[in-house]
Amino acid sequence: MKVAYPNIFVVLIGFYGLFFLTVKLRDSAWGLLSTFALTGFMGYTLGPILDRYLGMPNGGEVVSSAFAMTALVFVGLSAYVLTTRKDMSFLGGFITAGFFVLLGASLAGLFFEVSGLQLAISAGFVLFSSVCILYQTSEIIHGGERNYIMATISLYVSIYNLFVSLLQIFGIMSSDD
């Protein structure tokens, strides 16, 4: 079954609108409802992506591999931070720089047809999301992030990005093109 992916502008407006709404409402009961709306919307946008990969000849393996790897990375990184209790706040600068590098590479990918760029961007997002998970988990256990709504959405977005990036990598590596 082919599920149409929503218009990119609808996705961007929906995500950023719900994200900023959740940040604004984070200290009220409405923030919880906004969190459910944001995560539900992100799940809605994930449906057509999964449909595309499941339509590939080995799509089930690609999706299950990306899911398993995402779970292993998240549990492994979180366990590392929880057991070592290391303060990962020093990663803030790397996260900022990584964001701008990935933004620039993504924009370049829209305009230039460079072989392997999509794979490199996806690998960069895997690294970026992993560093964000380390940083956010450390912030949560060291009291830097005390708001459960912000902790939830920051980790959820990192896990979502990690999963989608791994899907892209496994999809590229398993295609015959």
Each predicted region: which residue ranges?
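A hydrophobic alpha-helical transmembrane-helix feature that marks the membrane cores
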Residues: M1-D177
